[in-house]
């Protein structure tokens, strides 16, 4: 973009869609955020995502939740999005609905490496279906974060070249969504912890704005 859009339509209220929606709105653009789930940041803690949704609504970002983009077209009036029966017209569109690992064209079949549309299949030591071949980063279909890919790469090199294989623990991975306020996460979500540990889980809320 070379100029600030008058009305930006964003499809997908994950981390990138949420960050960009708030950033462009604060720069002065009208923003409509379309999300198929019932809340923004649907993979984050429900309490945190509820707070972000309330902040967005208070700032004037239009949230269209439980909605799916069914049709897109462009004409002299702008970019049209038909979302759950409503036509929304803007002059810029951002699609933020996730990424698929780009593994086609690598001839993985010839090497006997198993993969799916979600990425190359690896075990907790980052070995593929061919134990002497390792994979790391976004191509494994795991967390798509730069810091996580770097950590995986270092573990893959260590396991491939040195004795004593290390295992990766996904529950340790932290991430942050740079909205305002920020949403930071590390370890299990409450629902995941309760599923694993039952009534042994305790929850404490600390208001950080007081």
What residue ranges belong to the model's regions?
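General small-molecule cofactor/ligand-binding pocket signal
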Residues: 62-64, 134, 202-204
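N-terminal Rossmann-fold NAD(P) dinucleotide-binding loop
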Residues: 17-18
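Gly/Ala-rich phosphate-binding loop of Rossmann-like dinucleotide-binding domains
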Residues: 21-26
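FAD-site-proximal beta/loop scaffold in flavoenzymes
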Residues: 1-5, 88, 92-162
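A Rossmann-like FAD-binding core segment of flavoenzymes
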Residues: 27-124, 208
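Mid-to-C-terminal Rossmann-like scaffold of FAD/NAD(P)H-dependent oxidoreductases
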Residues: 45, 58, 69-70, 99-102, ...
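Glycine-rich Rossmann-fold phosphate-binding loop(s) that bind the pyrophosphate
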Residues: 11-14, 138
